[in-house]
Amino acid sequence: MSGAQPKAVEMSGAAAVIAEVDASRIETRHRQGWVGHVTDSLPQAFALAKEAMDSHTPISIAYHGNVVDLLEYAVKEQIHIDLLSDQTSCHAAYDGGYCPVGLTFEERTRMLHENPAEFRRKVDATLKRHFLAIKELVGRGTYFFDYGNSFMKAVYDAGVPEIARNGSDKNGFIFPSYVED
């Protein structure tokens, strides 16, 4: 978890829930004052965000858990997300930069070393779910952009050609990357 995301959110007057699987990163950012709130409860994370938005109070919330769980929860609970990005280390998805859903950070680390083929299979399955959740949210009005972390390329490599224009990663992807306003 970067400290830049939650700090930028609060500076801009917004509300954000930022997922992170590594508790030590959350603890560091919270101790440094870069993120305001910490929870491992999705209902609590979104309730805090809604309360802050309703009162026009900036808030940054670190959710200790997997981003796919967070996004699938938002889909299931019909929670609108205005702006969505992803900062997982997808440039190194199979080297530990991406945590498969259903695994703790520690389980991810162990599986990466003990069973890399199974780790890769789980990463691919999770990337597919990640894409489907984003696609559903975008269909409901969420604006998603790639943070320049190779997320869309990783999804394509995981076996999802529909993330690419014309089904080929040579023609670009369906979501924008590195957005400026």
List the predicted regions and their residue ranges:
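Active-site/ligand-binding-proximal alpha/beta "capping" segment
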Residues: 60-88, 95
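Polyanion-binding loop/helix "lid" in catalytic or ligand-binding cores
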Residues: 61-63, 125-129, 136
